[in-house]
């Protein structure tokens, strides 16, 4: 059976790594590239804020080339759509027929992707789709994959009103 030429949409996060691992374990898909979006000014991924240099190191370690789609810092959905359409066209010329994602349950995101990609001849694949977060985490840990926290998000700039130290 000929494997389906596929691009994996890479965020650099644990769910993305787990979905990629599952897709690579399958004889169904030939992963020809990891695709990520990055802020043109900061050179960080738009999804998790991971430095592009780290994403490149991840791709090198995985053994699949990274394709970075540059996005304007203040660009909206129209800019994103245009940039992704160009990227899809590039991969369609190489015979890619499937885009693989690591989503679990975001129906609106999946619907958007399917609506955008189907007219371009790309089928959406979601190896983790419909599984509970607990099940995905358990499978991730059992897979032998490991994760390292490389970015965090500051949610509060002042002590919480519940902070016992204040």
Sequence positions of predicted segments:
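A short, aromatic/hydrophobic, helix- or strand-capping loop or linear motif
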Residues: 151-154
């Amino acid at each position: 059976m000929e494997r389906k030429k596929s691009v994996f949409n890479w965020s650099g996060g644990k769910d993305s790594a787990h979905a990629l691992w599952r897709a690579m374990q399958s004889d169904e898909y030939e992963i020809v590239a990891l695709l990520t979006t990055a802020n043109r000014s900061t050179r960080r991924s738009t999804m998790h804020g991971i430095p592009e240099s780290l994403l490149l190191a991840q791709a090198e370690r995985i053994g699949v080339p990274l394709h970075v789609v540059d996005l304007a810092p203040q660009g909206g959905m129209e800019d994103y759509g245009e940039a992704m359409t160009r990227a899809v066209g590039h991969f369609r010329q190489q015979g890619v027929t499937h885009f693989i994602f690591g989503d679990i349950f975001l129906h609106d995101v999946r619907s958007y992707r399917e609506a955008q990609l189907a007219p371009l001849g790309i089928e959406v694949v979601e190896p983790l789709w419909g599984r509970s977060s607990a099940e995905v985490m358990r499978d991730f840990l059992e897979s032998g994959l490991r994760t390292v926290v490389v970015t965090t998000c500051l949610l509060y700039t002042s002590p919480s009103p519940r902070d016992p130290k204040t």
